[in-house]
C-alpha cells in the first residue's frame, strides 16, 4: 500500500471520502467476524492515514445487522485440534494487539458505529475508538469467560479504564452483556441512538471532527493516552510540549484570527 492509496479485501471495504477515511466491515454472513487478512488491511489503512494529510478523521461501520462478532475462530483454527504451545503468544502481538494499539495511537480521531452485536475484538475496536455511537439495543459482550478462555486485544486494559473495574468485572469475568443504552449511561460508548439513526449520527460526528483542528485534536488524543501511565510532572511537561507544537499550526493561527474577528474558524487540518 502506497502512502496515499487504500486497499480493500474480502470482508473489509476501505475508501477515502474527502477528508474522511471510511472502513466498512463487510462480512455479514459471519457477523462481520474479523480474520487475519481483514485485520492486516485495517492496520495498513490506519498506518497510511497517519501519513496522509488528506485524512482528518476515520469512520468505522459495518454492513448487515451486526458490527463485529469477534475473531473468526473456526476459520482460523480449521484442521487444528489445539493451538501449539506459544502460538497464541506469538501471533496476538502481530494481529489483534497491533490493531487495537493502532486505533489508540493513530493521530486522527476515529468514530465507530455499532449496531447489533459487538463481541470480543469487535467490542474492543469500538471501545478503542475515540467516539462510538451504539444502537440502543446493541449487544456489547465479552464471550471469553463462557468459552474457558481469557480476553484478548486489550479488553482487560480498555474496559476497566472506561467503565471502572467493578462494571468491567461483570463483563470480563461473569460474561454479562450490556445494551448500547446501558453502555452509554456508564461511559463505555459516547452515545446511543435508535438503530436506524446510528450510522448517520456517527457520520455526522466524524465529519464534524474532520472539519476540526486536526493537529491539536491528534495531540489531545496523545495526551489523554499517555496521561494514563505518566506522572503528573511528566504529564505537565507533555502538555507544554503539545501546546508548543499546536501553536505552530495554521489552524491555531486561524483560530486566533477567527476569535478576534468574531466568526467561526475554518480549519484546514494543518
Show where each model-derived region lies.
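Terminal peptide-recognition signature
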Residues: 23, 27, 42, 60, ...
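Short, charged, surface-exposed hinge/linker loops at domain edges
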Residues: 221-230
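Glycine- (often His-adjacent) and acidic-residue-rich active-site loop
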Residues: 62-99, 118, 146-148, 231
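Crotonase-fold acyl-CoA enzyme core
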Residues: 101-217, 240, 244-249, 253-256, ...
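Conserved CoA-thioester-binding segment of acyl-CoA-metabolizing enzymes
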Residues: 1-63, 101
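Hydrophobic alpha-helical membrane-association signature
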Residues: 38-42, 92-95, 198, 239
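Terminal low-complexity tails and localization/encapsulation signals of metabolic enzymes
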Residues: 1-9, 257-270
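Hydrophobic/basic alpha-helical segments enriched in Actinobacteria
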Residues: 13-14, 22, 65, 71, ...
Amino acid at each position: 500500500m502506497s502512502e496515499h492509496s487504500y486497499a480493500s479485501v474480502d470482508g473489509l471495504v476501505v475508501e477515502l471520502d474527502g477528508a474522511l477515511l471510511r472502513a466498512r466491515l463487510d462480512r455479514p454472513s459471519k457477523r462481520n467476524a474479523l480474520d487475519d487478512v481483514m485485520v492486516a488491511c485495517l492496520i495498513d489503512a490506519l498506518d497510511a492515514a497517519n501519513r496522509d494529510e488528506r485524512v482528518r478523521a476515520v469512520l468505522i461501520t459495518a454492513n448487515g445487522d451486526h458490527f463485529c462478532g469477534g475473531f473468526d475462530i473456526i476459520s482460523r483454527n480449521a484442521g487444528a485440534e489445539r493451538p501449539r504451545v506459544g502460538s497464541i503468544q506469538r501471533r496476538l502481538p502481530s494481529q489483534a494487539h497491533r490493531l487495537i494499539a493502532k486505533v489508540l495511537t493513530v493521530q486522527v480521531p476515529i468514530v465507530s458505529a455499532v449496531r447489533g452485536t459487538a463481541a470480543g475484538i469487535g467490542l474492543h475496536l469500538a471501545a478503542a475508538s475515540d467516539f462510538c455511537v451504539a444502537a440502543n439495543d446493541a449487544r456489547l459482550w465479552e464471550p471469553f469467560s463462557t468459552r474457558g478462555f481469557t480476553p484478548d486485544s486489550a479488553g482487560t486494559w480498555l474496559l476497566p479504564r472506561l467503565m471502572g473495574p467493578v462494571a468491567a468485572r461483570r463483563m470480563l469475568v461473569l460474561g454479562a452483556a450490556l445494551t448500547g443504552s446501558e453502555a452509554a449511561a456508564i461511559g463505555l460508548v459516547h452515545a446511543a441512538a435508535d438503530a436506524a439513526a446510528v450510522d448517520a449520527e456517527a457520520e455526522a460526528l466524524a465529519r464534524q471532527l474532520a472539519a476540526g483542528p486536526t493537529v491539536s485534536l491528534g495531540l489531545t488524543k496523545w495526551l489523554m493516552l499517555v496521561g494514563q501511565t505518566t506522572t503528573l510532572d511528566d504529564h505537565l511537561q507533555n502538555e507544554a510540549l503539545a501546546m508548543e507544537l499546536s501553536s505552530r499550526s495554521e489552524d491555531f493561527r486561524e483560530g486566533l484570527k477567527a476569535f478576534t474577528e468574531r466568526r467561526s474558524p475554518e480549519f484546514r487540518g494543518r
